[in-house]
Amino acid sequence: MQLQTAVNNVFVQLSATLDQLSQDQYTQPCKTLFNATVGQHVRHIIELFQCLENGYEPGLVNYEKRLRDVRIESDKQFAAGLLTEVHQGLNRENKDLQLEACYDEHAEAPITLATNFYREVAYNLEHTIHHMALIRVGITEVSEIELPEEFGVASSTIKYRQQCAQ
């Protein structure tokens, strides 16, 4: 599936970057990220995919009910292992799902929207790339690591830049 390949490519890029960071850099608050850490952004990426995986069988996904597991944001080796697990969990058939969410902090009850597994994988892929752009900002602040030019950049933007360069 094209989506699985795209997610794999992004996860490989993210894992390779984590390998270059020290544990201290992974957990260092970044002023440019409002004192968030690279690890917190990685945790957020992983947990949204876990919510999708956990919601597959019952057919109901709620990203707001993620665990917010501090170990993911504080242990980069643990996080790297979870990236592999999450990718393996994407090897599933498409099926209809319900997405449950409160889009207003004052809402008393969530709304439910029709969606499907592949659509949610696509959402999570785009969400991951967005957070990788933020991670890029954080890494620039806490380290001297040279990131690939396409790190945190959507594939459509990469294609557009290539067309402009010709």
Where are the regions that the model predicts?
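Alpha-helical bundle segments that constitute or directly flank the non-heme di-iron/ferroxidase center
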Residues: 1-23, 39-57
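Amphipathic alpha-helix face/heptad-repeat signature
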Residues: 3-10, 37-38, 75, 79-82, ...
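Structural signal for well-ordered, non-membrane alpha-helices
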Residues: 11, 15-19, 46-50, 84-91, ...
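Short, contiguous alpha-helical
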Residues: 27-65, 110-152, 158
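Helix-adjacent hinge/juxtasegments
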Residues: 59-98
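Carboxylate-rich helix-loop segments that flank metal/cofactor sites and access channels
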Residues: 92-110
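Short, contiguous hydrophobic alpha-helices characteristic of membrane insertion segments
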Residues: 98-100, 154-162
